[in-house]
Regions:
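HDAC/HDAC-like amidohydrolase catalytic core signature
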Residues: 1-190, 195-240
């Protein structure tokens, strides 16, 4: 089996994140990818470098205004006197339908579910290569491979159509599933993780062509807290 990854995924350095009211060192560091890659190689996986697949497969899942924010937020943030090193929200709207704000500070709150997905100098580069890694692995399957391992960093299952969170920015599995839809009528995403894949669920909640299953700890006590309950069964065409 091939393991797909790109070295530029290591450029993203989130620094710290807010947990239990305190800023702590972010565990989603570049070294995490090294350990996963070493494990994949030890298991016999053959490394393959992905191509730049452009913005079309990413834009098929994520909104244009959100992608614009992710790409340019850091350079806009740096113009603020006394701002932190990375884009980090400090206010969140209780009603997102009231309109789209102009300030990058307000946009950070609009597009970030929490303070665990900061955007720093090289984040956008790594974010894109992580998504292209998922696209490339999906293309390998479409070309006839039985399986492929997309080593995606940053991860993606907490990323919504227009919102980051939980170390995630672009929803890599959702992007890959959409690519696979070119040749398959229905696709399934099985998400096994301590935390519920709330972003993935949200993206396909009203669709019947991608089936999402998340096996996770009880959100009554575990992040993401507000999603992942047994009564969440989809809506409209996606209800089941």
């Amino acid at each position: 089996m091939k393991v797909v990854y790109h070295g530029d995924q290591k450029k993203h350095y989130p620094g710290q994140f807010l947990v239990n009211g305190r800023f702590r060192p972010n565990p989603e560091l570049p070294e995490r990818m090294d350990r996963l890659l070493d494990g994949a190689k030890a298991a016999g996986c053959v490394p393959e470098t992905p191509e730049n697949h452009g913005m079309a497969p990413i834009g098929a899942i994520h909104s244009a205004v959100y992608l614009e924010f992710l790409e340019h937020a850091n350079e806009r943030w740096k113009r603020i006197d006394g701002a932190a090193d990375a884009v980090t929200p400090n206010v969140h709207p209780d009603r997102r339908e009231v309109g789209y704000p102009a300030s990058v500070v307000a946009q950070a709150g609009y597009h970030m579910a929490d303070a665990a997905a900061p955007v720093s100098d090289h984040s956008w580069t790594s974010i894109c290569w992580s998504a292209w890694t998922a696209v490339h692995a999906a293309e390998l399957i479409l070309d006839g491979a039985d399986s492929a391992y997309a080593l995606c960093r940053p991860p993606g299952h907490h990323a919504f159509n227009d919102m980051a969170g939980g170390f995630c920015y672009l929803n890599n599995s959702a992007i890959a599933a959409q690519v696979l839809r070119r040749a398959h009528g229905r696709v399934a995403i099985l998400d096994v993780d301590l935390h519920h894949g709330n972003g993935t669920q949200s993206i396909f909640y009203s669709r019947n062509d991608v089936f999402t299953v998340s096996i996770h700890a009880d959100p009554l006590r575990f992040y993401p807290f507000f999603w992942g309950y047994s009564n969440e069964r989809g809506e409209g065409a996606g209800q089941g």
